[in-house]
């Protein structure tokens, strides 16, 4: 087939408008506005396991990514589980504190996937603000526009401006899969818009001259949370090897997020045993086992990737910070856990 030359291709505005209109009622039987962001994340995660591959005969097919095969597939953590982990992790940080005291808390998932843990964290923080204002400062909060009641309901809603601020200031994530990063951003933006009217969002824009949807590029980033620039000391030729650079996706935490650490690290790190890690990323495995590796648990015979995520998470925490992971129970009883 021949590639289309973009400069010679012209598409009428009416065609684009028709495409968009076909996605919505009454031209489409699906009402995307009522789909829960968690469901969208689960749908997308079905496709994050696969990559397009060009075969030797020139045909294109989808194949499971090697790291997914070796870890028996990506695991989508159910919402009821993420909610429990978030409750246990964030409650000690938020309990008996004011919105001013928690305004600069930084919550991160360093293997965020499609963003389920970040969605639960965002929801927890939003609900914390609603309950605080209801119980301590309701009249002033209503007057300021921080909360308001839904028509015909006793339930309170946090203003879109406050939710937008929480997204920008409190929620952070990293994932090695660029598609997962985009899904996380998309899901979080949908969650922020939940229960907010178009009129409220437009009023915010007119009052502040800011975009209705915040740019989350500085919050949710693509990279390898476990491999930093120390890899270049292990393999000095890495900067001359573009394919290896693209594979490793070295991530400089200070450059990407500044010197500030996090108040909570949450997530469900991948479980990939050392034997499987060698198959899809020998370079990564050799780095973890080298003298340049910052990971103590990597020197054990029973290395599993989630060990490294525990170590990395602990190094990224502020004093008094909280780590909330789902890990196999055996970790508490083996030598690697003791380290």
Give the role of each language-model region.
Residues 19-23, 46, 287-291:
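Residues that form generic nucleotide/phosphate-binding pockets
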Residues 33, 39-42, 50, 148-155:
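Conserved alpha/beta core surface patches that mediate binding of polyanionic ligands
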Residues 30, 59-339:
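SAM-dependent methyltransferase catalytic region
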Residues 41, 45-53, 87, 91, ...:
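Glycine-rich, acidic and aromatic/proline-enriched surface loops and short helix-turn segments
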Residues 1-42:
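Non-catalytic nucleic-acid substrate-recognition regions in nucleic-acid-modifying enzymes
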Residues 18, 42-49, 186-193:
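Short, hydrophobic/amphipathic alpha-helical patches that form generic packing surfaces
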Residues 56:
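Short, helix-capping/interhelical loops that line the mouth of catalytic, cofactor-
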